[in-house]
């Protein structure tokens, strides 16, 4: 290899290195440009994403702020509405008081005017009476002067003349009255017989306000109470009956003034003890089952009463209402047994007097039917009984017997008189009634009725012998704040309207349940 070839090779290598360097530099520059462009794109995209996220967060914050604002406005609007309603009620009460005050003022003015007029009339009457006495004295003196007779002689002569003139009229009147008396003798005899009857021998048991459920062992008491008392609390809330668990061995006492509720509670507790499964869900099932059993017992009692009295073709609903009387007492006297007794007495009296025996028995059996629902419907038991008899198409004589047996209206038939007499005899029989128990029950019924008169109250139970009223409210209508207000209102009304010994505890129960079924 010569020198020229080496130079050419060396030159080629140098050219290759230079060209490679230039190419590599250009490639590096292009990559730098591309990398810078990519970085700019990434930064731009990141900025856009950041802007989008920022906008979304701002929108979410604005929406949340708007929701909170609307909620606050709604709450404020509700409070303002409540305040306006309270203000309206206060204004109405103030207007009513003003109207009553005006009426009282007007009545006072009218009374004063009447008193003034009466005084004027009294003065006028006194003046006229004095004038009349003066005239009488003048006439008497003039008559004595003209006739030459004294006052006593003139009066005696006048009486003799009047006696002679009336003697014939008196004789005629006596004959007419004798004839009229003979025509009415049958009716008069029947009415007299209706007041003189013998008492019917019947057995009554004074109803108590407690029932006792026997237990297999004392361990069952703990199961009835349940964890933290939830079982006993559930049973008391569902039935309205107090469960008294004390040192009495193998026994639980049920206390309540309503015999139907007490029987439902007793039946449910007996079934729970027999079943052995005692928890709130099972208690609800057993109480509902017990209600159906007691309904059947009530219906059977009504049918048995109609069978015993031999009364037929009575509406089934009326028979069931009649059966409810087996769980009602009047002054300690079982109302259904009292009604059966009145029916027997009325039937025997009707037979003696020749009246319709079947109709008299039917009237006697139904005379107190209004007492079966008088704690559920407004009005006296007489008014309710009349409405029931009309509703179920009973005879007009029976309707009048119900309406008149306490003297609210005049009796229109002998049967009505007989029913009233039989009712009085049954009630007056020694040992038939007890005043104290009836007054106690009426007080508890009044306590429950007063509590149930408020809106949103589903039911109310007087427990602890009337020392506590437990009020169950609808959670949709009564919230927590209104619950406190309701308890205070009931407390104030009890203090104003009722008389009672000691204190009465007002408990408002508000419960919300959410139930779903997994399939």
Swiss-Prot record:
Superkingdom of origin organism: Bacteria
Disulphide bridges, residue numbers: none
Topology of this chain in the membrane: Single-pass membrane protein
Lineage: Bacteria, Bacillati, Bacillota, Bacilli, Bacillales
Record Gene3D superfamilies: Hypothetical protein af1432, K Homology domain, type 1
Role noted for this protein: Endoribonuclease that initiates mRNA decay.
Localisation: Cell membrane
GO MF annotation list: RNA binding; RNA endonuclease activity
Species of the source: Staphylococcus epidermidis (strain ATCC 35984 / DSM 28319 / BCRC 17069 / CCUG 31568 / BM 3577 / RP62A)
Keyword field: Cell membrane, Endonuclease, Hydrolase, Membrane, Nuclease, RNA-binding, Transmembrane, Transmembrane helix, Virulence
Coiled coil (UniProt feature): none
UniProt gene name: rny
EC number: 3.1.-.-
CC annotations in GO: plasma membrane
Pfam families: HD, KH_1, RNase_Y_N
Residue ranges of domain HD in the record: 335-428
Xref: PROSITE patterns: HD, KH_TYPE_1
Name this protein carries in UniProt: Ribonuclease Y
